[in-house]
Swiss-Prot record:
S-adenosyl-L-methionine binds at residues 220, 249, 276, 322. SUPFAM superfamilies: S-adenosyl-L-methionine-dependent methyltransferases. GO terms for molecular function: 4 iron, 4 sulfur cluster binding; iron ion binding; rRNA (uridine-C5-)-methyltransferase activity. Belongs to the class I-like SAM-binding methyltransferase superfamily. RNA M5U methyltransferase family. RlmC subfamily. The lineage of its organism: Bacteria, Pseudomonadati, Pseudomonadota, Gammaproteobacteria, Pasteurellales. This is 23S rRNA (uracil(747)-C(5))-methyltransferase RlmC.
């Protein structure tokens, strides 16, 4: 086994399905899967398949999603082996995927749970308050975003009473919030977020691009690989004749900001429009653009497909898409196919739906492909592709 993980050995946690597979074999299997899915679009003497970008094999995750079980005096942070049995809690505080700094933070959180009287939610009895702890770290400055997912606001006064003691033990510039999820269901978070700190974001930095992590906004969980993903996209387009471009499903702006910075170094009039449904992510992207002092950059909280289909402006020179697992879907793919944009960048965490979208992008040729091992020890991977309009 390439990682010493007692939880996998005992089959308590099998999230890393491929833990017994040598890392080189994992990469080869992912490459085979990717080539199989995109084989109809690989053109001889044209499509360049670049070597995969590897990940660290441990401590690569920046985020822990912990189900809280056990008792208020002895909380268990990890998973429930049986979703409906509150006695089946497995403590995963020693998971080898987490950053080393989490090792010191988890005991602090267990102590805080006891002091604030945050009784773990019992799914069988529908009683208790604390459902999950969500912990995210910035690799840039080691600050953390700590979110307590509670059934109600009932324990807020006790949490606030114990907060100064907690903050004194957490890294500088950390963010603490309560998320209220009242439903009796295995839903990770609710809509209400109550910040207990003045700061509401933690700052990450990839390739001198500041990126801001907020609650309820998507952020890649493997920062080392993510930073190389964004840098690669930037490198692919930096010398192209681009006046304006779209970043659809832009999240916190990782792709768009990297590309805008490189393009505006040569031509400050280059325009970027970034579109994302999550208002929280758009607030982060806007904050980054302001800090970078980029001009002609607009981020808007809209549905990416609806924006593209309804836009009556000048056609962009480049469109970047980074959709969720379902892909961009047929209507948007067909629209982009007819739009006639010279260049497309498609980043995907699901090559199967990407290949389906490629079928509708028949006016484009696949020029570059690179696999990024964002999710080691699993069958999942990220893939970055570059498509050009057929002449």
């Amino acid at each position: 086994m390439i990682l010493n993980c007692p939880h996998f050995q005992q089959q308590d946690c099998v999230s890393c399905q491929w833990l017994e597979k040598p890392y080189a074999t994992q990469l080869t299997d992912k490459e085979i899967d990717l080539k199989r899915l995109i084989s109809p679009f690989i053109l001889q003497n044209f499509t360049e398949i670049l070597p995969p970008v590897q990940s660290s094999q441990k401590q690569f995750r920046n985020k822990a999603k912990m189900v809280v079980s056990g008792s208020v005096e002895r909380p268990i942070l990890g998973i429930l082996k049986d979703q409906i049995d509150p006695q089946s809690g497995i403590d995963l505080c020693d998971c080898p995927l987490y950053p080393t700094e989490f090792e010191a933070i988890f005991p602090i959180l267990k102590d805080f749970i006891a002091r604030a009287g945050l009784v773990p939610y019992n799914i069988a009895k529908k009683k208790g308050e604390l459902k999950y702890i969500l912990l995210t770290q910035s690799r840039y400055n080691q600050s953390v975003m700590l979110r307590f997912v509670l059934r109600s606001e009932q324990k807020r006064p006790l949490v606030e009473r114990e907060l100064p003691n907690l903050l004194a033990k957490l890294p500088k510039d950390s963010v603490v919030s309560l998320n209220i999820q009242p439903q009796h269901a295995a839903i990770l978070e609710g809509e209400t977020e109550i910040f207990l700190t003045e700061k509401t974001t933690i700052e990450e930095n990839f390739n001198d691009i500041p990126l801001f992590i907020r609650p309820q906004g998507f952020f890649q969980t493997n920062p080392n690989v993510a930073s190389r993903l964004y840098a690669t996209a930037q490198n692919w387009i930096k010398d192209l004749p681009i006046q304006q471009f779209w970043d659809l499903f832009c999240g916190v702006g990782g792709f768009g900001l990297h590309c805008a910075k490189a393009l505006q170094e040569k031509n400050e009039n280059v325009q970027l429009t970034g579109i994302e449904i999550s208002a929280s992510a758009i607030a982060s992207a806007t904050q980054s653009a302001a800090q970078l002092q980029l001009k002609n950059v607009t981020f808007a909280s809209l549905d990416s497909a609806q924006f593209a289909l309804n836009d009556k402006g000048k056609s962009p020179d480049l469109v970047i898409v980074n959709p969720p697992r379902r892909g961009i879907g047929k209507p948007l793919a067909e629209f982009l196919n007819e739009l006639g944009t010279p260049y497309l960048i498609y980043s995907s965490c699901n090559a199967q739906t990407m290949a389906k979208d490629f079928e509708a992008l028949s006016n484009y040729s696949l020029q570059k492909v690179q696999l990024f091992d964002m999710f080691p020890h699993t069958s999942h991977y990220e893939v970055l592709t570059f498509l050009v309009k057929k002449s």
